[in-house]
């Protein structure tokens, strides 16, 4: 069964449901704000921010209340703008060990929706906090729903099978068809010329005494 690329993307959790920046950068001791947008259907759902390279094992650091009220936890804050269908996560007093993979997520029945965001903290001077005094992000009690961590890989492979491979086959077929067409034209012209020559010879024999 053929699926268009748009329908194919919609068939995977998280695709087009929530979107965010692939990478954000902030200075050490400074702050960074990440804005993630979501579909209107998730307007009143709780939003969260978790840390970890793998979706299935990341730790939720902060979660909204399902309203537009700002929630704070240590150096983190989250605010949901339901009218604009977006929410913002602010990380303050950035540290070098805050550099990691994070996820913008939507809490829902069944499988949560999420998108990956890379956070990169760069140094701006020598007067920085020592790593011995750095504290980990607070972890919100409760577990997140477990989903496949290979979501993006599966999306790529499905696009490859349903879009790129058929397109390549169509292209090869078109080239072969054009090649056969160009080969037939000289053959038909040769037959036409041969028949014309034979007709001319027969006509000449009939006219001659």
Swiss-Prot record:
Glycans are attached at residue 97. The record marks 164 as: Interaction with TYROBP. N-glycosylated. The keyword Lyase does not apply. Residues 18-157 are extracellular. Residues 1-17 form the signal peptide. It is a single-pass type I membrane protein. It is found in: Cell membrane. Disulfide bonds join 36-104. Keywords: Cell membrane, Disulfide bond, Glycoprotein, Immunity, Immunoglobulin domain, Membrane, Phosphoprotein, Receptor, Signal, Transmembrane, Transmembrane helix. GO terms for biological process: cellular response to lipopolysaccharide; neutrophil mediated immunity; positive regulation of mast cell activation. Expressed in myeloid cells (at protein level). The chain crosses the membrane at residues 158-178. Pfam families: V-set. Residues 179-209 are cytoplasmic. InterPro entries: CD300_family_receptors (IPR050671), Ig-like_dom_sf (IPR036179), Ig-like_fold (IPR013783), Ig_sub (IPR003599), Ig_V-set (IPR013106). GO terms for cellular component: plasma membrane. The keyword Transmembrane helix applies. SUPFAM superfamilies: Immunoglobulin. CDD domains: IgV_pIgR_like. Residues 18-120 form the Ig-like V-type domain. The modification Phosphoserine is found at residue 196. Belongs to the CD300 family. Acts as an activating immune receptor in mast cells through its interaction with ITAM-bearing adapter TYROBP. Interacts with TYROBP, which enhances cell surface expression and activation properties. May interact with HCST. This is CMRF35-like molecule 7. It comes from Mus musculus. The lineage of its organism: Eukaryota, Metazoa, Chordata, Craniata, Vertebrata.
């Amino acid at each position: 069964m053929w699926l268009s690329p748009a329908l194919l993307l919609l068939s995977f959790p998280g695709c087009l449901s929530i979107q965010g920046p692939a990478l954000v950068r902030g200075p050490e001791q400074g702050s960074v704000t990440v804005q993630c947008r979501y579909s209107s259907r998730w307007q009143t759902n709780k939003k969260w921010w978790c840390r970890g390279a793998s979706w299935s094992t990341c730790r939720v650091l902060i979660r909204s209340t399902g309203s537009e009220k700002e929630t704070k936890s240590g150096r983190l804050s989250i605010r949901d703008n339901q009218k604009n269908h977006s929410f913002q996560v602010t990380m303050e007093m950035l540290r070098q060990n805050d550099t990691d993979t994070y996820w913008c997520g939507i809490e829902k029945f069944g499988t949560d929706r999420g998108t990956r965001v890379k956070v990169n903290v760069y140094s701006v001077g020598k007067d920085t906090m020592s790593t011995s005094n750095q504290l980990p992000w607070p972890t919100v009690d409760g577990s997140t729903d477990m989903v496949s961590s290979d979501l993006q890989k599966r999306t790529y492979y499905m696009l490859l099978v349903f879009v790129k491979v058929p397109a390549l086959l169509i292209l090869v077929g078109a080239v072969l068809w054009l090649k056969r067409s160009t080969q037939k034209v000289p053959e038909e012209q040769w037959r036409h010329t041969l028949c014309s020559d034979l007709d001319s010879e027969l006509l000449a024999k009939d006219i001659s005494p």
